[in-house]
Amino acid sequence: MKSPLGMGATSGVTWAGFGKDASRLRAQRGECRFVPVRGTQSFKMAERPEPLRLGSTAPNFKAETTNGPIDFHEFIGDNWVVLFSHPEDYTPVCTTELGAFAKLEPEFAKRGAKLIGLSANTIDSHSGWIKDINEVSGSNLTFPIIGDKQRQVALLYDMIDHQDATNVDSKGIAFTIRSVFIIDPKKKIRLILSYPASTGRNSAEVLRVLDSLQTGDKYRVTTPINWVPGDDVIVAPPVSNEEAKKLFPEFRIVKPYLRFTPLPKEKATVS
């Protein structure tokens, strides 16, 4: 199958269920192609895929990772998954980010969530770089990192930066941006974040959002600004006051549309 970048045969990634039938890929995600920008070596996306939105089914793919080959939907299984991309291996901001995620991996695991990284580098590059990450951060990085040299998964998930002229490789082709996707066990996308290449992410914030999503799914509540587990939550608007009295005996009305409540003690911790 011809690479979406027009650079020949693919390597490391295949479109699960598509084989060599590119038309089926176009039907699923919209046709995307690259054209050279006159006077530069960079490439500009002429037609971008249909954007993924909150609630979209996470597109499936097969890829090589530092932990071996995966089918993404099989990798998700019955778990939550945090899929995140970084621009390039052996770079300063990315090194600090992956070290931080590696240190928090046990906390994600407690919540039934898997981590998986991605960049437009080879598996060999990832494997060598992991040694640096562990040395610099004092971490033990064990989660898989996808080798997406041809940017196929990056295109599928719209992780390509086509505005920042500094975020390109030696051929002028755009690197991946700092994208984050939280995907639930039903394979639905629940969070999408995009950071510029110059700005490192906050791994604790990704964990906080996961806590919020899991709490909201389990109980009929939403979470206010800066919420962390143990703080009061907000009774969801569809819940009537009569229902709220049964569900949350300690709820209080601040405004008719704003009702706070602590979760019962046994409900305060997200499993």
Where are these regions (language model features)?
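N-terminal chloroplast transit peptides
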Residues: 2-10
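Acidic, Ala/Val/Gly-enriched low-complexity intrinsically disordered segments
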Residues: 9, 13-16, 21-22, 27, ...
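Chalcogenol-based redox active-site neighborhoods
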Residues: 17, 32-271
